[in-house]
Amino acid sequence: MRESRLWFWHILSAIVILVLLGVHMGTMHLGAILSSIGIGSGDPVKSAEVFHRSQQLIYMVTYILLLGAALFHGLYGLRSMLLELSLSKGLEKAIGSVCAVAGVLLFIYGSYVAVMLVRMPEVRP
């Protein structure tokens, strides 16, 4: 039952990654098309544009959601591959614990960075 639930979250995280990377690709790589319909705002990789996006709450939420989904998806996938090596139960538990702790620590650090970017005072390039 536990593995089925984890697998469900693994698939759900893949869907979240797919949607959020679609938004990223649209924002970063389809600027000309978006500008032609009035959504784009110039060159998306200029430092002023990057900083402007990082100051917006919606982008912070998007970054944190993508971070969480990518960390879970990647670390659960890594854990699943390692558990297929037919290791001892103790080692399997240790691998699961290391992946979980690494995921939580990386999520906390990444979320902290995203929040600090929103709270940064505006910098003029």
Language-model features: where?
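Membrane-embedded alpha-helical bundles that constitute the cytochrome b-like, heme-associated redox core
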Residues: M1-P125
